[in-house]
């Protein structure tokens, strides 16, 4: 690798997911000449919504750059790939009707495959937990697929593209492994294999599988701009999230390196996407969650319904104590603050600035699960601006009280807020110069 190779940018959700990453990625592709977008982790448990070209796109496993005719799209080795979902999503978003789409996407041969049996196991494992211990999984088989990867009986895309008899034997062994744990599982092995044979033929015909590590390094060497697109959110990271109520991969910046074969020294900027308030899907700790009219108002105005699950999102005030931790771990160089306009009609707005546990001020979030329930939140209160921000395109045109809110967040986490979302459309974005 030459020293002239271009640095990559990484975009991550800084909270519990659903921060509005798709909108920011879409803006960057259109305005910063992004040549390659790359997914590095997760699977079709993610959900990105992009509103562009007069229509709404929903992405779960596809990189958001797929809607741009000039952008190449990579699904990296760290992603777990459900091929049924992959082809279905291409059709649902109208990609298959675009000429030459297959020349703009590559799936890593080293990515692991998600099978129907993984989804069944996901559901069985969740059902076996007591109500208070349920994780709130999407039942897409993501966790069990990563478990197979670690157990070393996982099956990769390369296996599918090689000798099909060997692939079939590996698959049968995988099913038997799970049937020993869950005897009630019913799997149409022959039907599943027939479907994967069709997938194999389609992948080969369209030449969709390749060496994504080599491709990205080649693009960098040639001076192309690569944007790595994180899924889920930093507070759902398997190591640094609110364990065990987390996803099954590293959704922090380290996942960009391990999930694509990109060295840490190749990362030039890390953009953290932050919603102006806090949301969470499923179970797990949420110290600033609101159970009153304000919470219902955030849910209603913000249209807080999960793209992947269809579940209503839990809503609360933004948690700067957790956001500062997120910034510490990921080294954000820029922040994109989204959905600021949702707060336009709130006369009082709160932000969490600290935690106490048993009367003691905490310097870090609790590492022990049960401790979260006893956390006391320290808030700072702001007077709402009570003016519409939708349509504003310059930072100085925002209401003064709104700017005070933004400035406080910046100063608390010590990262500049460069992008401010004030509406769903692509153009509903304020771009600030770094101070």
Swiss-Prot record:
E.C. code? 6.3.4.4
Pathway this chain belongs to: Purine metabolism; AMP biosynthesis via de novo pathway; AMP from IMP: step 1/2
Keyword check for Ligase: yes
Q: Where in the cell is it found?
A: Cytoplasm
The UniProt annotation places substrate binding at 307-313
What's the short name of a Pfam family annotated to this entry? Adenylsucc_synt
Residue sites binding GTP per the record: 17-23, 47-49, 313, 339-341, 421-423
Record-listed IMP binding positions: 18-21, 45-48, 138, 152, 232, 247, 311
Q: Which reaction does it catalyse?
A: IMP + L-aspartate + GTP = N(6)-(1,2-dicarboxyethyl)-AMP + GDP + phosphate + 2 H(+)
Domain of life, per UniProt, equals Eukaryota
Q: Which GO terms describe its molecular function?
A: adenylosuccinate synthase activity; GTP binding; magnesium ion binding
CC cofactor note: Binds 1 Mg(2+) ion per subunit.
Residue numbers binding Mg(2+): 18, 47
Q: Which cofactor does it need?
A: Mg(2+)
- The UniProt record lists the keyword Cell membrane: no
* Annotated keywords: Cytoplasm, GTP-binding, Ligase, Magnesium, Metal-binding, Nucleotide-binding, Purine biosynthesis
How this chain assembles, per its entry, is: Homodimer.
Q: What does this protein do?
A: Plays an important role in the de novo pathway and in the salvage pathway of purine nucleotide biosynthesis. Catalyzes the first committed step in the biosynthesis of AMP from IMP.
Q: What is this protein called?
A: Adenylosuccinate synthetase
Task: Please name the source species.
Answer: Caenorhabditis briggsae
Name of the gene this protein is made from = adss-1
């Amino acid at each position: 690798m030459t020293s002239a190779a271009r640095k990559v940018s990484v975009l991550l959700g800084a909270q519990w997911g659903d921060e509005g990453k798709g909108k920011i990625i879409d803006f960057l592709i259109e305005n910063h000449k992004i040549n390659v977008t790359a997914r590095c982790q997760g699977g079709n448990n993610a959900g990105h919504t992009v509103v562009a070209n007069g229509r709404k796109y929903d992405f779960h496993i596809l990189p958001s750059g797929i809607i741009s005719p000039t952008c190449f799209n990579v699904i990296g080795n760290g992603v777990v790939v459900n091929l049924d979902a992959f082809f279905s999503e291409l059709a649902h978003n109208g990609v298959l009707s675009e000429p030459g789409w297959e020349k703009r996407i590559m799936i890593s041969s080293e990515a692991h495959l998600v099978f129907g049996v993984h989804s069944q196991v996901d559901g069985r494992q969740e059902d076996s937990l007591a109500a208070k211990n349920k994780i709130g999984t999407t039942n897409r088989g993501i966790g069990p697929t990563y478990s197979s990867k670690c157990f070393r009986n996982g099956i990769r895309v390369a296996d599918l593209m090689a000798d099909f008899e060997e692939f079939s034997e590996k698959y049968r062994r995988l099913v038997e492994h799970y049937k020993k744990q869950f005897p009630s599982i019913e799997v149409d092995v022959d039907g599943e294999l027939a479907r994967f044979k069709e997938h194999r033929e389609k992948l080969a015909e369209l030449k969709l599988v390749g060496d994504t590590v080599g491709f990205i390094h080649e693009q960098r060497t040639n001076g192309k701009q690569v944007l790595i697109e994180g899924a889920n959110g930093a507070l759902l990271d398997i190591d640094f999230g609110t364990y065990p109520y987390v996803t099954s991969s590293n959704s922090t910046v380290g996942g960009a390196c391990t999930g694509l074969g990109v060295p840490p020294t190749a990362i030039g900027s890390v953009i953290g996407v932050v919603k102006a308030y806090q949301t969470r899907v499923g179970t797990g700790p949420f110290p600033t969650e609101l159970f009153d009219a304000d919470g219902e108002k955030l849910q209603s105005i913000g249209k807080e319904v999960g793209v992947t699950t269809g579940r209503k999102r839990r809503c609360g005030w933004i948690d700067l104590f957790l956001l500062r931790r997120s910034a510490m771990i990921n080294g954000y160089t820029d922040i994109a603050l989204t959905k600021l306009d949702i707060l336009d009609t709130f006369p009082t707005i709160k932000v969490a600035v600290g935690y106490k546990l048993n009367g003691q001020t905490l310097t870090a979030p609790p590492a022990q699960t049960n401790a979260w329930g006893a956390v006391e939140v320290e808030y700072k209160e702001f007077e709402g601006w009570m003016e519409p921000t939708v349509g504003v395109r310059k930072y100085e045109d925002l209401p003064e009280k709104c700017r005070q809110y933004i400035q406080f967040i910046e100063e608390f986490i010590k990262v500049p807020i460069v992008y401010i979302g004030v509406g769903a459309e692509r153009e509903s974005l304020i771009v600030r110069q770094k101070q």
